[in-house]
Curated annotation (Swiss-Prot):
This is Conserved oligomeric Golgi complex subunit 4. It comes from Saccharomyces cerevisiae (strain ATCC 204508 / S288c) (Baker's yeast). Its main location: Golgi. Acts as essential component of the peripheral membrane COG complex that is involved in intra-Golgi protein trafficking. COG is located at the cis-Golgi, and regulates tethering of retrograde intra-Golgi vesicles and possibly a number of other membrane trafficking events. Possesses ATPase activity. Belongs to the COG4 family. The lineage of its organism: Eukaryota, Fungi, Dikarya, Ascomycota, Saccharomycotina. Signal peptide: none annotated. The gene is COG4. Keywords: Golgi apparatus, Membrane, Protein transport, Transport.
Amino acid sequence: MEGQKSNASWESSIIEGQLSKNLARYTLLLDKLSTLSQIDKLSEVIANDYAKQSKQLNAFVQQSQSSLNKESRKLELQRTNLTTTLTQFHETVATISSSNARAKAIHDDIETVDQERALVNKTLQFVKDVRTLKNNISLAHSALETKDYLVAATAINEIRSLPDKKLIVSEFAKKVVPSSEIPEEPAILIKNWCKELTSLFQEQFMEATRTQDIKELTLMFKMFPMIGQDVLGLDLYSKYVCDIIADESRKIMSNSMENSTKFQGFFSQVLLHLFKIVSTIINDHSKVIATCYGKKHMVHVMEKVEKEADLQASLILDIFMETRKIERTIHDINEWEHSQKNEDVNIDSNQSDIETDGETEKSSIISIHDLALLIMEFSQILQNWSMYSRFYSVKWNEFSDLHPHVLQPPPPIADGKFALKLKQDKVFDEFQVFVLNHLQRSFRNSISLEELPSLNDLITAVPLNDHDNISYPVTSVLDDLILLVRKNLISVVNTGQFKLLASFLNELVKFFQNRFLVKFMQNKFKLLQSKLASNVSLKRYIPKGEEQSATSRSVSPPANKFSPLSRFTFRGAAASALTNIQSNLQAVVAEDEDSILALHHYLIYLNTLYLSKVYVHRLLSIEILEDDSQRILRDNFPFDNDAAQLQNLIINSEKLVLEQTDKLSKWAVKYLFQNILQNRVRNLLGTVFVNSASSNSSTSNQKNVSRDYSAGSNQKNYITSIEDFEDLSQINSFNSKWNQLIIPYKNILHNEAYAELLSVIVDYIVTTLEQRIWTLEFNELGVTKLDRELSLFIGNMCGLNYNLREKFLKLTQIVLLLGLDDDNFDLTTGDIKDDFNGTFDWVINSQERIKARNMKIDRTQ
């Protein structure tokens, strides 16, 4: 153990370079030797070190040799083990090689057996097929002799259905199948039989079509694919159903043609019946075709059927155009429209002439009633085509195994003769001409028959809260117009034609903008504005005849025939003067009554504008786009992305109409305020929020107060004491007079119209009061009184309408600022302190806040 430690220490000393260090030390000592004794000592140290190092080296060599011997023995032992393992490995490899050879031999044997089995099965199947061939030939031969064609066709079909198509021409079949009774080769025999049966089936099919023997016809039709004549069977069947379509169409037309001009809707029903026949054929006969021929062959029949349907539909359309004299009607309408454009009539100066233009039409033009019936029949024709196109497209995709994300019309529909005819003959354009002409002429008639309701029952200071959209007073023209637009819109939507509805929406926007808003509504407003007196007030209208019947006798001329100069007296002169005064008063009264009636009509037309927006939204958005009505577009416009595009068009059209209506309605409301209500509101405001406490002492002093808001005359209103702090008579009087002024308008006007009018009034009031409040002076009690008055003022005027209350924000902040304590203000700047400034979103700036504080006369300086 000690030897191992010494060896380890010696080895570590070698690794650490101890010998080199000792040598360097000896060299250094050698240089410093000066005496003999030092040399002896150095020699002794070197000898000791040498002996020590030699001993350690011997021990290290011995230890290393021993360790090396141990490792060598271990390696020898491992080599022995590896040799044994290698021997076993070679034995295993030899065993695997032997097994592999044996497995390959077995696999080869199995493959050989499988091949032999496959050959045996193939031979067996071949023999079975030959036997089937021979049996079916024998069966077909016997069936042909007994004229059992179904059995014969079934046997031939089984022969044709054999998996090996070359079996019938094989040498084995040629030798085995023929017999003494049937010596022909199978291939030649089957070919001759198919040819013979083809001719026979065709003759019997044609005979069955002539005799209408449906059972025989169906049997023959089923047997064509059995003998390999699929195309012939489909062609014959297609011709048969096309003949049915043509015969039915001619039968209907010939039976009812003599009464067609009297029977409106006749042609649409004929076309509907035609499409029903085609749809029934496609639905019912598709089962037979799919069973006997395969579903994919139904497309072939549908193509043939559609050609015949297009032909008959085009014929019906031609007869319709000729019988209803479409071309002549279009010509008359164009002439009428041209004559209307050439008439230079000023609607502003002579509204009645325009209103009766619709009645002074040429006698040759179609009547509005007949035009409406024609549009209905025309719409039904296009609707029938649209519904049939959708049905045909769905069935086409079903039989073609197509599953498109968006339904598209197949080529027989999109490129068919009838669709091409609708485009080339400009049928859509003609239909739109009818619709627009009906809309324009009917609107003219509704103007000529206009009725306006009476407002007398609504003119009261008592609020009426039972209004709905139906009960608002409007002109009868609006109701007629909405009914007309709805009727024509339904006719256009029912056609299912994207082009028609898109074009009609554009024309409808133009019609609303030009005919309704400008030529009718705007001209009505301008005509009434010329009749409105600035001092007119909203009160009940009493016709002149009822009011003056009692006084008409007193102002009638005398019955005598004497000259006025022959008997002049003071009494006669006084009577004459009285008569003249009464006549002048009556003229003034008549003028006032006309102005009152004009104001009534103005409010009715204002309601008409706002109700028209409600009706247009209901007509376009609610009835067509919202809730369950969304199916209207999807059902009538199923192709491509038509429904989504039309939805956007409808939304944009409504937006355009509402924008134009908003402009006109705001203009009308603004005129109503500026010319009728502004002076009255100004007079009412003259008594409130003013310096003079006696401003409401007399009525004659109100105008002067409203013009002079300075604080020069009597500054006591908001410099109050305990005695007059509770005096709110001014604001209560204003609220009472305000209610008397505004409630009749609220009872009459539509909510949105009233809200717009009130918004305009509030804007004016806010502007006036914001200018007036800077002229006031306050003490502490006066500020509190102002706060109470302003709260009552705003509450009575705005109610729960917070949008209107927001307009008074600047005034309320001024009052709030006046009520703040002096501690909240910075004495240096005069403005509120910074820590308090951040608690409010101020709409008044710093200068205004300083100015507002200076209005208090009892503040701390």
